[in-house]
């Protein structure tokens, strides 16, 4: 069975507190969602603002393969705004629970039904595909839902949706509810789950078992309050655990996750299922030993299947085999005696409560073996100008030993650190395609001259390195960390 994916990252996802996308941001995400293979892109709510309509129009003009949808209330003015944007469909939402009808709408069931049907008729008269959606359906009278959906079919609704608006479903109740609705409604039924009790993915999958044929999801599970059902979790679970297919190109899940994270400025939790950096990370010696022998011992799927990668983390729980495996992955050969010394230093770091980054491990290797990692690109000069009413600007002069050339570049930024890193990245762009994946400041002591610890993650192709640097000067610490990471990737 093929399950359709209705992505609402650009509507429900953008309603995450603190998130606001520009029209161009919306377009960039929509194009990636289309490449990913979603069936429907809910591009926003056209009535919201002029900027929202501009973003939706950019998407509809792009000629994407996905159906482009706008959220609307059961109001002609909302539908008119959607029509102005030239969308393919509307997600027409009607509150159906007693608490919503009494306190929000101040209407009876009959009045709500009449309003909904008139709105469906109006949208259909104007050539739109209509998905009639019951808001707070899981706290509604199921017989009223069935009546609404069947009456909606009579006036032209194309499909219907059951919304678990406040996330109160359980997997068992979800399957039972959708079984009853699909047995009594002819139209295709969608499921829309929120994650207030952490069960959005499970409830969505159970709804499919009950007969739902389309899942509403968001990338990274973002959304209001605790978020929505996660696209990557739902798609992977349906495929691997239940045997249902979708059109999603699963190998692109990690990439799309990071694009949404960057544009929405919402970091992906390391332990996030499927796309988190720790989703396929291993530290415990027993686990790594099993992994080396057969990856299926501690991984339910191969990370490459979802565009992620396996990571071996070193710390106090690591064993010698894990260390040797990590060094082999990094292309570092050491003797047994050197391996034992490196292992002891790793344990010392771990007992001090320190996480050992790739750069830390290389530093330990250099200390034990006396071998230095070749510095292929050297920072010769760094100048940063910043201040009140001055756009931060930085210039760098680098020496690339590989071709014995000097690289000089200037770049602006939203702050002096951003400007400095942008200048370095711009300077090396002709040498290698290296992307900054993550930047954070982890430890700040007291006082204005305190040491600051900066952590950066850089990516070259599928390789990612993490570097930590400490300095009283945050700009210097940041640039040093980036430079060390670049040299690690070039080696």
UniProtKB/Swiss-Prot annotation:
It catalyses: pyruvate + acetyl-CoA + H2O = (3R)-citramalate + CoA + H(+). One of its GO terms (biological process) is isoleucine biosynthetic process. It holds the Pfam family HCS_D2. Its EC number is 2.3.3.21. SUPFAM superfamilies: 2-isopropylmalate synthase LeuA, allosteric (dimerisation) domain, Aldolase. PROSITE patterns: AIPM_HOMOCIT_SYNTH_1, AIPM_HOMOCIT_SYNTH_2, PYR_CT. Pathway: Amino-acid biosynthesis; L-isoleucine biosynthesis; 2-oxobutanoate from pyruvate: step 1/3. It comes from the Archaea. One of its GO terms (molecular function) is 2-isopropylmalate synthase activity. Residues 3-254 form the Pyruvate carboxyltransferase domain. CDD domains: DRE_TIM_IPMS. Homodimer. HAMAP family: CimA (MF_01028). Belongs to the alpha-IPM synthase/homocitrate synthase family. NCBIfam families: LEU1_arch (TIGR02090), PRK00915.1-2 (NF002085), PRK00915.1-3 (NF002086). PANTHER family: (R)-CITRAMALATE SYNTHASE CIMA, HOMOCITRATE SYNTHASE. This is (R)-citramalate synthase CimA. The gene is cimA.
């Amino acid at each position: 069975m093929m399950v359709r994916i209705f992505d609402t990252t650009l509507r429900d996802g953008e309603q995450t507190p603190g998130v606001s996308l520009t029209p161009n941001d919306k377009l960039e995400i929509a194009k990636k969602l289309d490449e990913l293979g979603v069936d429907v892109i809910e591009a926003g709510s056209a009535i919201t603002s002029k900027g929202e309509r501009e973003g939706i129009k950019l998407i509809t003009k792009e000629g994407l393969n996905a159906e482009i949808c706008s959220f609307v209330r059961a109001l002609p003015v909302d539908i008119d705004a959607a029509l102005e944007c030239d969308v393919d469909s509307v997600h027409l939402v009607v509150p159906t629970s007693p608490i919503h009808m009494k306190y929000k709408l101040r209407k009876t069931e009959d009045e709500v039904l009449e309003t909904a049907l008139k709105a469906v008729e109006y949208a259909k008269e104007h050539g739109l595909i209509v998905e009639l959606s019951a808001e707070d359906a899981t706290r509604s009278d199921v017989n009223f839902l069935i009546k609404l959906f069947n009456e909606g079919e009579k006036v032209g609704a194309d499909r219907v949706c059951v919304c678990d608006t406040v996330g109160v479903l359980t997997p068992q109740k979800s399957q039972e509810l959708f079984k009853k609705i699909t047995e009594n409604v002819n139209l295709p039924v969608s499921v829309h789950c929120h994650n207030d009790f952490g069960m959005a993915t499970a409830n969505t999958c159970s709804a499919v078992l009950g007969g739902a044929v389309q899942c509403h999801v968001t990338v990274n599970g973002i959304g209001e309050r605790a978020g929505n059902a996660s696209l990557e979790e739902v798609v992977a679970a349906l495929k691997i655990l239940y045997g249902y297919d979708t059109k999603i190109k699963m190998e692109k899940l990690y990439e799309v996750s990071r694009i949404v994270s960057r544009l929405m400025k919402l970091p992906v939790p390391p332990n996030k299922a499927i796309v988190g950096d720790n989703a396929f990370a291993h530290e415990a010696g027993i686990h790594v030993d099993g992994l080396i022998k057969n990856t299926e011992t501690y991984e339910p799927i191969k990370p490459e299947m979802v565009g992620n990668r396996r990571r071996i983390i070193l710390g106090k729980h690591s064993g010698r085999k894990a260390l040797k495996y990590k060094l082999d992955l990094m292309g570092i050969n050491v003797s047994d005696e050197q391996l034992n010394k490196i292992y002891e230093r790793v344990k010392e770091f771990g007992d001090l409560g320190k996480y050992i980054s790739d750069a830390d491990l290389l530093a330990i290797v250099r200390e034990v073996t006396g071998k230095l990692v070749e510095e292929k690109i050297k920072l010769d000069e760094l100048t940063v100008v910043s201040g009140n009413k001055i756009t931060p600007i930085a210039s760098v002069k680098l020496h690339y030993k590989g071709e014995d050339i000097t690289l000089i570049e200037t770049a602006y930024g939203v702050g002096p650190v951003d400007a400095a890193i942008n200048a370095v990245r711009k300077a090396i762009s002709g040498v290698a395609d290296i992307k900054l994946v993550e930047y954070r400041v982890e430890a700040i002591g007291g006082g204005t001259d305190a040491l600051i610890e900066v952590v950066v993650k850089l990516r070259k192709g599928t390789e990612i390195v993490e570097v930590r640097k400490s300095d009283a000067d945050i700009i210097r610490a940041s640039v040093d960390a980036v430079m060390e990471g670049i040299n690690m990737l070039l080696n």
